[in-house]
């Protein structure tokens, strides 16, 4: 990061390679449009490069870049009035460490696809702030503090969003015939 702050284009390109997937993933969730998300990801990195001097080196780079991506996506949604969408699942909401990717809930591929569809439908019914908090927690592996930084909300609010979303997802999946405890 020090070299990028010093103006090294090669160092910044390395940052882009490192964060391209999480930024694109976040933007696809926000917009529901991969082509638009790719454009917004490029815009995100241009903004990050232009604002490197504003980066607080005491913070995590991932949270800063994802915050820029979030703002860029929200701005685009406001301009285009796109409804936010999200996909994913996760682990314990009270765990302060970043989440690991969840293991498949069922070994049967057909059942796994059906569960994924049920989960996607359930996620689509959540409030956008809850969907985004869940996605940042379980897809991007951010801590609650980092989620708070990205969404500009207190850590306790980030915890609450994730907890309430998980509770609602469990209720919706159970209503659809899935046992959320398996």
Label the model's feature ranges.
Residues 18-21, 29-32, 135-142:
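Short helix-capping/turn signature of helix-turn-helix
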Residues 50-57, 67-88, 111-112, 164, ...:
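Arg/Lys-rich amphipathic alpha helix in sigma70-family domain 2
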Residues 83-112:
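Internal acidic/polar
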